[in-house]
From Swiss-Prot:
This is DNA polymerase IV. PROSITE patterns: UMUC. The keyword DNA-binding applies. GO terms for cellular component: cytoplasm.
Length: 360
């Protein structure tokens, strides 16, 4: 179990894109809002970027093929992704968070880690988290969920524990107990298929995983097995990475169910490419190298990169490069995770480097 004085907050905006759309048009409040591809004009291709909690009651979720979402919720409100507007709101939120921590690590457009060790105690950090939630609501009209823990991984799990608009505090001596009864799939890096494989092996909870020998876990999960086994035993040493440098910008997503569907994979990758391109432009940066990452069902992870002839921040150029890199991965093998990274950056950097796990 982690000991020491580190206190980490994970702040995760609730249904970010959909919530912004409801803020922009209050008549959408209480209705199933789905942000993503056009289910009709796009011939049913593409995926759901995010959706409101009302839409989730019909089984709709992020990463789902938009055609499936329309089957489940034909009466939903389907809206296109307005990435520049969402990015501008993200800048507001990150500026707000920066007022409360000297070290902040933004890991996506709608989530960040804060090192609040200076708070001095977990009760004080909990009060700070409550104040942050209140400020976010008052200043942006949006809600967020916050996890407070000794390390990043547990803080992230905790932020998802009472969504939406939740606050969960896990003190150092509570980490192992907090994790023990959770389904094994709640550990970051364990997807739906691997979770099912573990359950068939009798590993149903995080506690079950903690009791297994680390070599068995490595055999099942590969090189991520050590990290996962440590976390299952309450060892969470993840530190918040600050603004010491901006070496790359990354975005990735894990599918709810593994998919080999080329339109779904291509549509998801295009969304991710647009996301990182928007972040690049917002930070006044340009890139030369585009990398696509694919993780298959068996946790085999592969990357392909292309160095462009010149520095660029053009979304279409980045999207085309990413799409070309994806083609060799469309081999019929089910994909668990897909991601895009931009590197070889030049220009002013106002954000943090992405967490190493994105492209490890």
């Amino acid at each position: 179990m982690t000991t020491g004085s580190r206190i980490v907050l994970h702040v995760d905006m609730d249904s970010f894109f959909a919530s912004i759309e409801v803020r922009r048009d209050p008549s959408l409040a209480g209705r199933p809002v789905i942000v993503g591809a056009d289910p009709k004009g796009g011939a049913g291709r593409g995926v759901v970027s995010t959706c409101s909690y009302e839409a989730r009651r019909y089984g709709v979720h992020s990463g789902m093929p938009i055609s499936r979402a329309f089957d489940l919720c034909p009466h939903g409100v389907y809206l296109p992704v307005d990435r520049p507007f969402y990015a501008s709101v993200s800048v507001e939120i990150m500026a707000l968070l920066s007022r409360h921590a000297g070290r902040i690590e933004q890991v996506s457009i709608d989530e960040a880690y804060l090192d609040v060790s200076d708070a001095g105690s977990f009760p004080a950090a909990g009060a700070l988290a409550a104040a942050i939630k209140r400020e976010v609501r008052e200043e942006t009209g949006l809600t967020c969920s916050v996890g407070v823990a000794p390390g990043k991984a547990v803080a992230k799990i905790a932020s998802d524990f009472q969504k939406p608009d939740g606050l969960t505090i896990v003190r150092p001596d509570e980490v192992a107990g907090f994790l023990a009864s959770l389904p094994v799939g709640r550990i970051p890096g364990i997807g739906k298929k691997t979770g099912e494989d573990l359950r068939q092996a009798g590993i149903l909870t995080v506690g079950d995983l903690a009791r297994r020998d680390v070599q068995e876990v490595i055999a099942r999960l590969g090189r991520s097995g050590v990290r996962v086994h440590h976390l299952a035993r309450g060892i969470d040493d993840g530190e918040v990475q600050g603004r010491e440098g901006c070496k790359s910008i990354s975005r990735e997503t894990t599918f709810e169910a593994d998919t080999a569907d080329p339109p779904v994979l291509a549509g998801t990758l295009a969304e991710l490419a647009d996301d990182v391109a928007e972040t690049l432009r917002a930070d006044n940066l340009r890139c030369r190298t585009v990398t696509v990452k694919v993780r298959y069902r068996g946790f085999q992870t592969h990357t392909r990169s292309r160095t462009l002839p010149r520095f660029t921040s053009d979304p279409e150029t980045i999207r085309r490069a990413a799409s070309g890199l994806l083609l060799p991965f469309l081999n019929g093998e089910p994909v668990r995770l897909i991601g895009v990274r931009l590197s070889m950056l030049e220009g002013g950097c106002t954000r943090q480097a992405s967490i190493d796990e994105f492209f490890s």
